[in-house]
Amino acid sequence: MPNYNIPFSPPDITEAEIAEVADTLRSGWITTGPKTKELERRLSQYTQTPKTVCLNSATAALELILRVLEVGPGDEVIVPAMTYTASCSVITHVGATPVMVDIQADTFEMDYDLLEQAITEKTKVIIPVELAGIVCDYDRLFQVVEKKRDLFTASSKWQKAFNRIVIVSDSAHALGSTYKGQPAGSIADFTSFSFHAVKNFTTAEGGSATWKANPAIDDEEMYKEFQILSLHGQTKDALAKMQLGSWEYDIVTPAYKCNMTDIMASLGLVQLDRYPSLLQRRKEIVDRYDRGFAGSRIHPLAHKTETVESSRHLYITHVEGASLEERNLIIQELAKAGIASNVHYKPLPLLTAYKNLGFDMADYPRAYAFFENEITLPLHTKLSDEEVDYIIETFKTVSEKVLALSKKS
């Protein structure tokens, strides 16, 4: 048997990406410029949205969405307890109060009945999270928001454009996902995407903010606000300032520095060309995994349903009957067999930062149950079918072995 060493999620970079980056390096313009603008345009085409703003991370995108909406002190923003910290930390960055909701049984989505109960007169935004690229139930989300419309009081220009709680999707994993045929980005009111090195589509670091078409939104004005907030509050970006005689500018708010560079965008332009084939290969791998685990104690999340076609960013599984300790032993045994794996994620109330904010894991039992026996397997386009088969057989064997030993002891 071959000696395997299977990484969790390496980037898929070809000579085409390298050539495009080299072209940018030779061009004399490497920060935000024409290639960033071109990537924004093409991403808007891909997601069927009016505008896209490329930034240096999805976290920056999520925070800037809240800042454009002028969410701040005295406001509440609702997030699921089962997510990565970035979904929630941005709420504290703007001075608002995070409100966590437990998830449904056997899935990562918020319990929509609990969500409805969590809404108050202070609720300004709900942040659903598309874990692994699996899109949430937006029909239900918008029903909840409409039902609670009378509680909402707008306190800013863009809040008035909605006149209800705004749904801001954390779609870090979901570029290429669809809900009832609609692409992620065009479903929620606002959406943030991640282009981090481990994502399906990468610019090394990076992310974007976008919004769905809305007659109450002036898209050019909205885009300009994002641009200003992403570059110190400056009224001109670097490319505009460098035009002959165009040095004059103003700072209209003491803002941030989170713009994307043309070096990063160069990667993205080629990745977007390749993206259909990258998604197809991920689908083939997930289908192979699903067939291999059918009838076993390994239960993966479903990436395709009647309403959802996932981007298949993560292959999240649960090991039936495994305790937290057994789950951790299985991960160690997989590592010994040359298979990298991961856990997505520690629920937020388990983390020190959120304990210090007063959150208690005991209040979110289903989030803990989801975490307790969860293992994420390698899912990337460099995996061979042979490696996938090895992972399947090893994972099943190791899981049975660990659970059998636990019963004996």
Where are these regions (language model features)?
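Conserved active-site segment immediately N-terminal to the catalytic lysine
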Residues: S155-T202, K224, W247-I251, H299-P300
